[in-house]
A protein has these predicted regions:
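Substrate-binding strand-loop-helix patch
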Residues: 181-186, 209-221, 237-257, 273, ...
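C-terminal "lid/loop" region of Rossmann-like NAD(P)-dependent oxidoreductases
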Residues: 207, 236-238, 247-253, 260-281, ...
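Glycine/proline-rich active-site loop of Rossmann-fold NAD(P)-dependent oxidoreductases
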Residues: 153, 178-191, 198-201, 217-218, ...
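Short, hydrophobic alpha-helical segments
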Residues: 228-232, 259, 312-316
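Hydrophobic "lid"/C-terminal helical patch
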Residues: 17, 192, 221-228, 252-255, ...
Length: 326
């Protein structure tokens, strides 16, 4: 079986992808963010029998030498390492350029030099901005509505340029909003669940009118692997989406009904995006991934929410419910 590197393996989607790859028999190398505590993020929570199967490389995606060293001897790379919090990108855009654009450049250059068989570069539905039409297919225009989305657009275009200029075997993987166990409370679903499970009677949220297309994380991980395993995806940009949308307000009401029907939603102004930066509608098309791969959505939204609530209930100690997680 192929040897693969997962950058950002210590994060939310990356840790689930790492697990899914192990289950499919891949030889997995995990690139985690170096820290002096020698912690490996969410990988530390995996059972020992799984963790023992993973080769861990701690480094910094911004360091080209470390990235190159990590990529030596691997057949394929799943590049997920990134800064992803939109509110923090308003405060620290420089760090997003360094991590998301330069980090991707480091992966692409190393892949070119090392002759890597295939590279999956992770995009985001945020590159589309507010939908100009729905469902949003891969031909939809890009709109940089936040420093975060602008850096992901830049990373996508770098990946495209390396495919066109150097014939580098790249696939751009574009998941719509993903949720599930291990997600931080900077994302809306765990924000709602953690406040409710902490016994809050008032659930603080930002704007309730935007709509989103939510993937359960195990379906997202399966999408990455399906794109990697298909010979038809090189040079392509591919959505992972459910073609189902729900407003943040309706989402909150559904979760509140399951945990504490007496809770009320209140607007917390610090959670509101600047008006022109708010992405008001995201509803993705998934015809292309179904055409080029054998991917199919396996989890309903309701199943995913149930699994997420159950996991967070068992792991509330990992969350700080009294602060706004930027």
């Amino acid at each position: 079986m192929k040897k693969v590197l997962v950058t950002g393996a210590d994060g939310f989607i990356g840790s689930h992808l790492t697990e899914s790859l192990l289950e499919k028999g891949y030889d997995v190398k995990a690139f985690t963010y170096y820290n002096s505590f020698n912690t490996w993020g969410w990988l530390d929570t995996l059972p020992k029998e799984k963790l023992n199967q993973i080769e861990v490389f701690s480094g910094d995606i911004r360091d080209p030498n470390g990235v190159r060293e990590a990529m030596k001897g691997v057949d394929q790379v799943f590049h997920l390492a990134a800064l992803i919090a939109i509110p923090f990108s308003y405060h620290s855009p420089d760090s997003y350029v360094d991590t998301n654009i330069k980090g991707t450049l480091n992966v692409l250059q190393a892949a070119r030099d090392l002759g890597t068989e295939k590279i999956m570069v992770t995009s985001t539905s945020e590159v589309y901005g507010t939908a100009q039409y729905v469902p949003i297919d891969e031909k939809h225009p890009f709109q940089g509505q936040s420093p975060y989305s602008a850096t992901k657009i830049g990373a996508d275009r770098l990946a495209e340029s390396f495919y066109r200029s150097f014939n580098l075997p790249v696939a751009i993987v574009r998941p719509f909003n993903t949720f599930g166990p291990r997600q931080s409370a900077r994302a809306v679903i765990p924000t709602i669940i953690t406040q409710l499970l902490a016994g809050k009677e008032e659930i603080k949220l930002g704007s309730l009118t935007p709509t989103r297309d939510f993937n359960y994380v195990k379906d997202t991980a399966a999408g990455f692997i399906a794109i990697a395993e298909s010979d038809k995806t090189i040079g392509q940009e591919i959505n992972i989406a459910t073609q189902r949308e729900i407003s943040i307000g309706d989402l909150a009401k559904e979760i509140i009904a399951q945990i504490n029907p007496d809770a009320k939603i209140v607007c917390d102004e610090q959670r509101l995006r600047p008006k022109k930066s708010e992405v008001n509608r995201l509803l993705g098309a998934n015809a292309k991934i179904k055409e080029l791969t054998d991917w199919k959505q396996q989890y309903t939204f309701e199943q995913g929410i149930a699994e997420t609530i159950a996991w967070i209930r068992q792991n509330m100690a990992a969350y700080k419910t009294d602060i706004y997680n930027v």
